[in-house]
Amino acid sequence: MQVDLLSSAQSAHALHLFHKHSPLVHCMTNDVVQTFTANTLLALGASPAMVIETEEASQFAAIASALLINVGTLTQPRAQAMRAAVEQAKRSQTPWTLDPVAVGALDYRRRFCLELLSHKPTAIRGNASEIMALAGVANGGRGVDTTDAAANAIPAAQTLARETGAIVVVTGEVDYVTDGHRIVGIHGGDPLMTKVVGTGCALSAVVAACCALPGDTLENIAFACHWMKQAGERAVARSEGPGSFVPHFLDALWQLTQEVQA
């Protein structure tokens, strides 16, 4: 297994492209992380929209640059809205990303996510336990937390990517991005990032946005992971704990975009 790495120059170019295109991201995400997710996208130069009403979700999925489906606070009415949005995204060729939160621990959301896979997501982003469960390798995880190392999920991620045609992202101490054949590893970040609710969910939104960019989708998604880890490292250096981390993290994302515009 060969794991490729990406250069800082490539990352900076991709971030410049991201800011230039300013993707409009339809975020059907969970209630806990909506504000943080929106602010993360804004800091990087994207435009978030949290449209969840069933009658509007399908309409908005047709005009958005990208769609995010995050099942963290899934309910039956929300599942209906998500289903409508995904079906419209498929018709409109809007790229969409699935974040299968806690899919290994809860049956209803696992069945729902497996149903959505038939609509061919552009990307899937989860921790090791979630990706392994979605691939049918194992069930588990402690709710939203993983009980497996990211590297252990690489074979499952490759299988899932080949079966669905999606780019699969396994996040952890090292993030891995694969299309079933190529694998890119992204190092960095800090353990403090796991002490703040929503960093993974926000990453999924950035991944969704990157699916709307021109060029190599796998590499663009890998850059999303790199930007988040890079901003996390900068934020931790200025923080005293989780409470002060969040504003420093948003500032760091913003500063990254300003640096590539200079």
From Swiss-Prot:
Annotated source species: Escherichia coli (strain SMS-3-5 / SECEC)
Highest taxon listed in the record's lineage: Bacteria
Binding positions (ATP): R125, T171
A GO molecular function held by the record: hydroxyethylthiazole kinase activity
Signal peptide per UniProt: none
Name of the protein described by the UniProt record: Hydroxyethylthiazole kinase
Involved pathway(s): Cofactor biosynthesis; thiamine diphosphate biosynthesis; 4-methyl-5-(2-phosphoethyl)-thiazole from 5-(2-hydroxyethyl)-4-methylthiazole: step 1/1
Gene3D superfamilies in the record: 3.40.1190.20
EC number: 2.7.1.50
Function (record text): Catalyzes the phosphorylation of the hydroxyl group of 4-methyl-5-beta-hydroxyethylthiazole (THZ).
Matches recorded under Pfam families: HK (PF02110)
Catalytic activity: 5-(2-hydroxyethyl)-4-methylthiazole + ATP = 4-methyl-5-(2-phosphooxyethyl)-thiazole + ADP + H(+)
Enzyme class: transferase
Record keyword Lyase present: no
Cofactor names: Mg(2+)
Family: Belongs to the Thz kinase family.
Entry keyword annotation includes Nucleotide-binding: yes
Keyword vocabulary terms for this entry: ATP-binding, Kinase, Magnesium, Metal-binding, Nucleotide-binding, Thiamine biosynthesis, Transferase
List of residues binding substrate: M50, G198
CDD domains: THZ_kinase
GO BP terms, alphabetized: thiamine biosynthetic process; thiamine diphosphate biosynthetic process
